[in-house]
Regions:
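Short, small-residue-biased leader/transition segments that mark boundaries at the very start
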Residues: 1-3
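Conserved PLP-enzyme active-site core in the AAT-like
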Residues: 8-30, 34-272
Length: 273
């Protein structure tokens, strides 16, 4: 943070951040923004149009707002178990494959992409399994649709895959993260969550058409492409935060704290999701 680069264009801090994001996710095209909802605004300005339908798992409020504000529709395809707050199942944030397939059968020509929120924030931060991500990818490929991850808590999602899904116990968080993102065409990120910083966000993708289409809106709404509303300090901090928070011990510390609180709530009979 102390050696940040405040250059308007071509700041070294941006390239440190870009290299970290690419190493963790595999995505080559990066657009920084000042926070997650700004990333949605920039990308959706290119992707979402009036009358579109965007299916996903319990869209976050800003995601839904950016879709509906463009006179499009956010279609919830979350599994029914997510509505039962006291039901304990490993992956209550999953997309329901049957609901998603039905949406594509009926409205394929109006669907620009499928969005998966990891973890499912609106449904209480419930995780999405790797198997479910593969199912979504297969359905998307069947209908020729891209997949976008809303990734504010992607590292926590990787943690739950490691601790709850068969075959992942011996994989590192970084390995699981890379596998998750291999099933998506792009991501938006609110960095104040799993980036463990107090400001920032970004878009990342391997689709050049998404990058080329969105970058003009970044300049219009956020700033030049190598800072996008973030200063050098914040970009340097985010590069470190993403790296540190994709380590198991760091994630487990916070999740165990939440688990402790949940056990206390159970003692007093207070429901929670």
């Amino acid at each position: 943070m102390c050696i940040r680069d405040r250059s308007y264009a071509g700041a070294s801090s941006f390239f440190k951040l870009k290299d970290t994001i690419t190493r963790l996710t595999g995505f080559e095209y990066i657009i920084p923004t000042h926070q997650g909802r700004a990333a949605e605004n920039v990308l959706f300005s290119y992707l979402v149009h009036e009358g579109d339908i965007v299916p996903g798992n319990s869209h976050f409020d800003t995601t839904k707002g950016h879709i509906e504000g463009r006179k499009a529709f956010a279609l919830d395809c979350t599994v029914d178990e997510a509505k039962q707050t006291q039901l304990e199942v490993p992956f209550k944030g999953n997309v329901d494959p049957a609901k998603l397939e039905k949406a594509l059968q009926e409205h394929a020509d109006r669907i620009p992409f499928i969005i998966v929120t990891i973890t499912n924030n609106t449904a209480g931060g419930q995780p999405v399994s790797m198997q479910n991500l593969r199912e979504v990818r297969a359905i998307a490929d069947k209908y020729g649709k891209p997949v976008l991850f809303d990734s504010a808590r992607f590292a926590e999602n990787a943690y739950f895959i490691k601790t709850r899904e068969k075959g992942y116990q011996d994989k590192t968080i970084k390995q699981i993260t890379r596998e998750m993102f291999s099933l998506a065409d792009g991501m938006t990120m609110s960095a104040k969550k799993d980036g463990i910083v107090n400001m920032g966000g970004f878009i990342a993708t391997n689709r050049k058409d998404w990058y080329e289409g969105a970058k003009g809106f970044c300049v219009q709404f956020e700033g030049y492409l190598t800072y996008g509303g973030m200063n050098g300090r914040d970009m340097n901090a985010l590069a470190i935060g993403l790296d540190e928070n994709t380590e198991f011990d760091n994630l487990e510390t916070r999740i165990r704290q939440v688990q402790y609180l949940a056990c206390k709530l159970d003692e007093y009979g207070i429901p929670y999701q």
